[in-house]
């Protein structure tokens, strides 16, 4: 059986990236909550090379 985690930087960015979050009202709420909470990172790091 294929595992659930198949790493892919592009899909990660498209799904969970900052611009993806900003695109929807729900995503903006996520960012707002994470800012209120004082998270260092609002979205997962994708561009690490």
Swiss-Prot record:
Keywords: Ribonucleoprotein, Ribosomal protein. GO terms for cellular component: ribonucleoprotein complex; ribosome. The keyword Phosphoprotein does not apply. PROSITE patterns: RIBOSOMAL_L34. The keyword Cytoplasm does not apply. It comes from the Bacteria. Residues 26-49 are annotated as: Disordered. HAMAP family: Ribosomal_bL34. Part of the 50S ribosomal subunit. Found on the solvent side of the large subunit. NCBIfam families: rpmH_bact. The open reading frame (ORF) for this protein is entirely within the ORF for the RNase P protein (RnaP). The two start codons are separated by four nucleotides. This is Large ribosomal subunit protein bL34. It comes from Thermus thermophilus (strain ATCC 27634 / DSM 579 / HB8). The lineage of its organism: Bacteria, Thermotogati, Deinococcota, Deinococci, Thermales. The gene is rpmH.
